[in-house]
């Protein structure tokens, strides 16, 4: 896979912002088939920084109920499952996209 296929998007939330500022951890939404080595290589290629370590989490899909305007359930569905990557960098390294 190419680097742009592995890294889907950065995750920008309050929790990820505090982690980025305090312990220099960046969080990305990644391809479900990517592994740690591929994620590390993609970060190195795209942002020109060398990650110290990388942790991956599989986020399971959740059941959802589609509700009509009157409040009646009219169908059931699921959200998509996805994968999250925590990328640890050295203190002096930064990623400029954030």
Curated annotation (Swiss-Prot):
One GO CC annotation: ribosome
InterPro entries xrefs: Nucleotide-bd_a/b_plait_sf, Ribosomal_uL23-like, Ribosomal_uL23/eL15/eS24_sf
Keyword rRNA-binding included in the entry's annotation: yes
Entry-linked Pfam families: Ribosomal_L23
Transmembrane regions listed in the UniProt entry: none
Family classification: Belongs to the universal ribosomal protein uL23 family.
Protein name: Large ribosomal subunit protein uL23
Protein encoded by which gene: rplW
